[in-house]
Amino acid sequence: MASPSTDRLHLIEYLQDPGNPDGESRERLIEACQDVIASLERPIETARKQAFLTLDHAVIRSAIKLNLFKALDKEDRPYSTQELALATTPQCNHVLLSRLLRYLATRPLRLVIETSAGFWQRTARGSVFAQDSFKSGCSMYFDACGPAFQALPTWICTPDHERLHSPFQVAYPGQGSFFKRLQEDDSMLQTFQCWMETVSRHQFCAQETIDFNEWIPDGTSDSDVVFVDVGGGTGDQAIALGYKRIGLPGRIINQDLLPISQEAEEMLRSHNIERITYNFFDEQPLKGACVYHYRQIFHDWPDADCERILRRAKDSMTASSTLLIDEVVLPETGAHWMNDHKYNGVACYST
């Protein structure tokens, strides 16, 4: 890991000769910028920034709910406040909308630009939230997880013998777990699945560097189960393997408890992938498969539940089966921003 001083030198070099940095260099530049900002901030600026983070999220969620970013994204030109008020769905009072737009234009949000008095234009950052794939994350965390985040201080300061299983239970009394609530709210479930698909597309995938076919022996028949993606959501990993096994024998199975959209089911069928409703805490109905695959499942569950899931996998395996776990592992020190997910787990899933 590069030192902060090295990253700052890298930033100076970049400012002198801007280019198109690769992935690692880009992350180092962002970290260097953040270090510089942190070193320049006055205490009152730090306090104000943190105090308004919740409002930032609420304003962005309001704009998403009004379809404001989609309205701005139709054409790359300035729009008047009155024009946008008519274009939002539902239509918004132009005075309230003007206040919302002014907030979205402030630093560090910069999600719109005020080109002149009462006229607004999209930015590249704001256009991100015109896309369903990206706006789903903001919507899900605000609507579903936000109350659990708000309950975290109360939960964590409660004595051990009085503390409920998770902050989610403080925020949603009597509603069980986060995943149980998803099953009972179709709109939230669709938003969650859309966000999971988006995250999956932008995260490291083991299949990019490992050929899963290594664990599938030659001589398999059409009836043999060669790959079971347990808790596989809408099936992106099963589909990725399906592309590599076109014309080869064997059944590829996608398992999950949560229902998926008709479009996702049709996508699986078009790739000859079977979909089975399955709770990974129950006995695995598919015995002796070549590969049982778990991608980013275990960080959502406490240790005891992870052991239960693994026991079910072990009981279904034979000597020729392989267990593949694709998971996020955090170092004790110097953790990446993915550490945020750890506290997301504490708040919503009690991991």
Swiss-Prot record:
Family of this protein: Belongs to the class I-like SAM-binding methyltransferase superfamily. Cation-independent O-methyltransferase family.
Listed GO biological process terms: methylation; secondary metabolite biosynthetic process
Alphabetical keyword list: Methyltransferase, S-adenosyl-L-methionine, Transferase
Annotated positions binding S-adenosyl-L-methionine: G231, G232, N279, F280, R295
EC primary class: transferase
Designated name of the protein: O-methyltransferase apf6
Record's description of how this protein is used: Apicidin F, like the other known apicidins, is a cyclic tetrapeptides with anti-malarial properties via histone deacetylase inhibitory activity.
Keyword Chaperone: no
Domain of life, per lineage: Eukaryota
Induction: Expression is positively regulated by the apicidin F cluster-specific transcription factor apf2 that binds to the eight-base-pair motif 5'-TGACGTGA-3' called the 'Api-box' that is found in all promoters of the apicidin F cluster except in the promoter region of apf2 itself.
Cell inner membrane listed as a keyword: no
GO molecular-function terms, A-Z: O-methyltransferase activity; protein dimerization activity
Function: O-methyltransferase; part of the gene cluster that mediates the biosynthesis of the cyclic tetrapeptide apicidin F (APF). The non-ribosomal peptide synthetase apf1 incorporates four different amino acids to produce apicidin F: L-phenylalanine, D-pipecolic acid (D-pip), N-methoxy-L-tryptophan and L-2-aminooctanedioic acid. L-Phenylalanine is the only proteinogenic amino acid directly used by apf1. The 3 other apf1 substrates are non-proteinogenic and have to be modified by other enzymes of the cluster.
